[in-house]
Regions:
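Catalytic center-proximal scaffold of phosphoryl-transfer enzymes
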Residues: 1-391
Length: 391
C-alpha cells in the first residue's frame, strides 16, 4: 500500500514491487487493493470524526506540545463520471483539501528575534521567481519576464543560516475530497486527537482563501489559535503591485522594499495608506478588466491586505515562536499531487478519496499507517475471489 500511494501510478508501483521486492502484482489488482484499504481507513477516520462531534474522542497524547500549528491549503486533481462506461466521460478539475497538523519546539521571546527581512526577500531575481511560483495559478505577473538570476563567476560566500524560530516535531496530514464543512470537522478531529488544542502557543497559517479562514473561525479560533497570513503569498502580492504602480524597474523595486519592511514589522496602516495612494494614482480599473491590468493588480493587493489585516502582526508572531509561512502544507501538497495530479489521470470520487487516505497516512509521522494495520480489518471478500474457474 505504501508504494501504491507513493509511486506516480499503479503501473509504476507494480513495476517497483516486481523489481525491488520480487512481488508480482498487476496494476489493476493493486488498484483494487488500494481502493479497498483506503476506504477502510476513510471509515476509521469518519468514526473518529463522529466521536469528536459527540465529545467522545480520546486524545492520543498525555502531554500537550509547547507550540502547535495547523496549515490549510488545497491541491487539484481530475475526476470523471461514475457511470460513464469506458473512457473518460465528463472530465473536471476538482480540489482536494489538505491540512498539516504540526507540533513545534519553540520558545517565546521578549524581543523580535529577526527584525530584518531575510535576504531572500531582498534579492530581485529570487523575489521575482518566488512571486511567479506563488502566483502561477493566478494572473500573469508584471515585472517578471526579464527577472533572471544574474550569472556570476565568483562563488557567493556561504551565509550562516539562521536557526528557525520554530522547529517541527511531528507532522500529521489530513486530506480529502469532501466539501469544506466536512473537511473542517476532519481537521478539527485530528487537532483534538493530537492534543494540539492544548498547546499554549498555537497558530493557523494559511493563504488568503476565504474558506480556510471560515474553518479557522469555526474550529480553531475557539481553542485560542492565532490566525496568520502566509507571508510568502503576501510578498507575491506586494511584488506585483509595486511593478504595476511604478513603471521604472528601479523605482518599483524601491517601492517593494518599503512595503516589504512595513509588512515584515507588522505595520499595516502605512502599508494600506501607500496602496490607497497607488490606487488613487492609477485610477479604478474598468469593469471586466484583465487580472494583469495594473489598476486591477493594485486594487486586488489592497483588498487582499484589507481582508487579512488582522493576521499580519508578524513581529508578534516571531516573538511567540510561531511560523509565518505555510510552506509545510505546500510541500505536502506537492507530494500528494505527484500521486494524484496529471493530465492523464482521471479519478472516480471513491478512488480519489481512497488514495488520499493512503497518501495522508504514509506522509504522517505518527505511525498512523502502522496503527491502522494493527487493527482488526473488517471481513470482506478477497479481491479477485471467484475469478478462477473450477478445475
Amino acid at each position: 500500500m505504501r508504494q501504491s500511494s507513493k509511486a506516480a501510478s499503479f503501473k509504476e508501483a507494480s513495476d517497483d514491487l516486481e523489481a525491488l521486492a520480487e512481488v508480482s502484482i498487476s496494476p489493476t489488482h493493486l488498484q483494487r487493493l488500494s481502493e479497498r484499504v483506503g476506504k477502510e481507513w476513510a471509515q476509521q477516520r469518519d468514526r473518529e470524526v463522529q466521536a469528536f462531534r459527540e465529545d467522545k474522542l480520546v486524545c492520543a497524547y498525555a502531554a500537550a506540545p509547547p507550540a502547535a500549528a495547523v496549515m490549510l491549503d488545497g491541491g487539484r486533481l481530475q475526476t470523471r463520471a461514475e457511470d460513464g462506461g469506458r473512457g473518460v466521460q465528463e472530465p473536471a478539475w476538482r480540489e482536494n483539501k489538505v491540512a498539516c497538523c504540526l507540533s513545534l519546539s519553540s520558545t517565546e521571546q521578549a524581543e523580535d528575534p529577526q527584525p530584518e527581512p531575510p535576504s531572500k526577500f531582498l534579492e530581485a531575481p529570487r523575489v521575482a521567481r518566488l512571486a511567479a511560483e506563488v502566483k502561477s495559478r493566478g494572473r500573469p505577473a508584471l515585472g517578471r519576464a526579464e527577472a533572471k538570476p544574474a550569472a556570476s563567476a565568483k562563488k557567493r560566500r556561504r551565509k550562516k543560516r539562521r536557526r528557525p524560530a520554530s522547529k517541527k516535531r511531528v507532522r500529521t496530514v489530513v486530506a480529502s475530497m469532501a466539501n469544506s464543512e466536512t473537511f473542517g470537522w476532519q481537521m478539527a478531529a485530528e487537532v483534538k486527537r493530537r492534543g494540539l488544542d492544548r498547546a499554549r502557543r498555537k497558530a493557523c497559517v494559511c493563504d488568503g482563501q476565504q474558506y480556510n479562514w471560515t474553518l479557522f473561525e469555526l474550529h480553531l479560533l475557539p481553542w485560542g489559535f492565532i490566525g496568520i497570513l502566509d507571508f510568502v503569498h503576501l510578498v507575491a502580492y506586494l511584488h506585483d503591485a509595486a511593478h504595476a504602480w511604478k513603471k521604472d524597474r528601479g523605482r518599483a523595486w524601491k517601492q517593494y522594499v518599503q512595503w516589504l519592511r512595513w509588512a515584515w514589522s507588522g505595520q499595516v496602516k502605512p502599508l494600506m495608506a501607500s496602496l490607497r495612494q497607488a490606487t488613487s494614482d492609477l485610477g479604478e480599473p474598468p469593469q471586466g478588466a484583465a487580472d494583469s491590468d495594473p489598476r486591477q493588480t493594485v486594487k486586488d493587493t489592497l483588498g487582499y491586505i484589507q481582508n487579512n489585516r488582522t493576521r499580519m502582526d508578524y513581529a508578534r508572531y516571531r516573538r511567540l515562536g510561531l511560523p509565518t509561512s505555510s510552506a509545510p502544507v505546500e510541500s505536502t501538497i506537492k507530494q500528494i499531487n505527484r500521486r494524484v495530479k496529471g493530465t492523464e489521470k482521471f479519478w472516480l470520487d471513491g478512488g480519489a478519496e481512497a488514495i488520499l487516505q493512503l497518501r495522508a497516512a504514509y506522509l504522517s509521522e505518527d505511525d498512523r499507517a502502522a496503527t491502522y494495520w494493527a487493527r482488526q480489518r473488517p471481513y470482506a471478500r478477497a479481491v479477485g475471489a471467484g475469478r478462477l474457474r473450477a478445475a
